[in-house]
């Protein structure tokens, strides 16, 4: 949930952060629900599909939960809070990540650019959710620290 958390925090941080870095994060939970090839995790993590009005926060005891205790995780999707984004963001994603498609990172990057927020997209055509190739790892480290140097030294 690291990348998801970064995208969510970008809309809820009240100027506590000078920049953000999101790696393979979920930007739009509804889009993610439909575009992943792995159907078990979205149902487990989110409780059910976006068509459900209320989802139990405890799937094992769903029948014991009343309507006031139900939540809809799709209402906390980071993309719904882009209007609050105001902080530079670096989005990193691997195009061979079939669980969280690169369109999530590309969408977050595009949202930031359209809002006039400084943003950068580091897209690996040959990596999945993990950066495994040594040369790509070096690029990841250099980009990561260059981004921090740029925004934290101001």
Identify what each model region corresponds to.
Residues 1-154:
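Active-site-proximal cap/loop segments of hydrolase catalytic domains
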């Amino acid at each position: 949930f690291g990348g998801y958390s970064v995208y969510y925090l970008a809309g809820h941080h009240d100027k506590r952060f000078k920049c953000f870095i999101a790696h393979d994060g979920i930007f739009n939970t509804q889009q993610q629900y439909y575009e992943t090839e792995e159907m078990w995790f979205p149902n487990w993590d989110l409780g059910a599909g976006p068509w459900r009005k209320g989802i139990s926060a405890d799937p094992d005891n769903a029948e014991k939960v009343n309507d006031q205790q139900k939540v809809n995780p799709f209402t906390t999707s980071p993309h719904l809070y882009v209007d609050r984004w105001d902080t530079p963001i670096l989005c990193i994603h691997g195009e061979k990540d079939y669980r969280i498609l690169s369109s999530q990172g590309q969408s977050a990057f595009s949202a930031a650019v359209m809002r006039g927020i400084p943003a950068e997209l580091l897209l690996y055509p040959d990596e999945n959710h993990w950066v495994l190739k040594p040369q790509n790892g070096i690029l990841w480290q250099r980009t990561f620290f260059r981004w921090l140097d740029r925004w934290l030294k101001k």
